Each structure stands twice: as C-alpha cells, then as structure tokens.
C-alpha cells in the first residue's frame, strides 16, 4: 500500500494500516473508509479444494458484497495471487467515498485529494482508534476489525445518542453508524 501511494497508484489508499496479506483480502472483501478490494480486483488465481482445479477466476466469481464473499460461504480453496487494477490519476486519489475521511480533511464527499494526504489521514484516524500496529505499543496489536458498520435510515439514526459517530452516505436518507461506538457503549471496551 505504501508503495502504491508513493508511486501514484490510486484505488487502495484508504485501506492504509489494515493488517494482513494480499491473499486474504478477497475472503473478507477487505476495505475501509469508502474503498474495498472488490473495487480493484480483476482476477484471482484460485485452487478449488473440492475439484483440485487451479484456475484464474474473474472477480465476479467470488460474489463480493460488503465485507463478504463466496469464500465465507462454502467456496473453499487456496488463493495463489490476486491481480489489482489501480489507477494513475496524477497523484490524486479516486473520488473519496467516506464521510469520515472527508470530514477529517475538510473536503467535500467525492473529492479527489493527494494520495499521500488520504493515506496520512487514514493512518491518523486508525491510530486514534488503536487500529494501527506500532512497534512499542502492545495495545495496538490487532488482526483488524471483522464487524461491519450498520447503515440505517436517517430517521432511525436520530434515535441514537447525539455523541455517537455517524457518517453520511451517497443516498441522503442513509447514515452509517459506528459499530465501534456501539460495541464500546454496550459495555465491551477495547
């Protein structure tokens, strides 16, 4: 990820700081801050456990959806490699699709910003939540988050306390709620 940003490749910059390896990304459809790998995966080398067939499969084969794929629902096998389609946008990001990032940097939803600014902002936000591994901080060790932030109607979002984090969505009648806030305020601290 750092290499992609340093070399002006856009499409994964908002996933900075997520722990793990490339081969695991299709399983969870890893993502964060408005980006997910299904947006940039073109094909995957896949060894089907059931048939023993080694084949290059298109992204559609994995039935990606929000933090989900067929690999979590019975499709078993080994991922050899993943091909990503990244974009060269003169050092700019893809249009930002995260209310958290746009609020953090003071930009409009859909803005294209310098890749390094997006990466730095994501790392800063993730660090503030204890979600970036730091050598001298044992509390930062994490395997990443496996929950999804719930999306509710705007009217439903008004039923939650005002101090709860929430972010606007492209559909103005929808609001993304902070799963982390909900979990911590249900009595399960970090």
Residue map of PLM features:
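Anion-binding (especially nucleotide phosphate/pyrophosphate-binding) glycine-rich loop
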Residues: 1-51
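Phosphate/pyrophosphate- and phosphate-bearing ligand-binding catalytic cores of soluble enzymes
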Residues: 54-190
């Amino acid at each position: 990820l750092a290499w992609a940003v340093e070399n002006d490749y856009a499409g994964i910059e908002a996933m900075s700081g997520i722990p793990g390896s490339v081969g695991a990304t299709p399983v969870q459809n890893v993502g964060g801050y408005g980006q997910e790998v299904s947006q940039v995966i073109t094909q995957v080398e896949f060894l089907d456990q059931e048939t023993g067939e080694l084949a290059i499969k298109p992204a559609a084969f994995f039935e990606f959806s929000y933090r989900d794929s067929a690999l979590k629902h019975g499709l078993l096998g080994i991922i050899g490699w993943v091909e990503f389609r990244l974009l060269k946008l003169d050092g700019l990001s893809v249009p930002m699709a995260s209310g958290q990032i746009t609020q953090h940097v003071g930009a409009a939803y859909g803005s294209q910003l310098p890749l390094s600014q997006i990466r730095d902002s994501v790392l800063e936000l993730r660090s503030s939540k204890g979600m970036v591994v730091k050598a001298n901080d044992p509390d930062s060790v994490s395997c990443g988050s496996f929950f999804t932030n719930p999306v509710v109607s705007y009217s439903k979002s008004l039923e939650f306390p005002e101090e709860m984090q929430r972010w606007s969505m492209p559909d103005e009648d929808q609001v993304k709620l902070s799963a982390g806030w909900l979990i911590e305020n249900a009595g399960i601290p970090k």
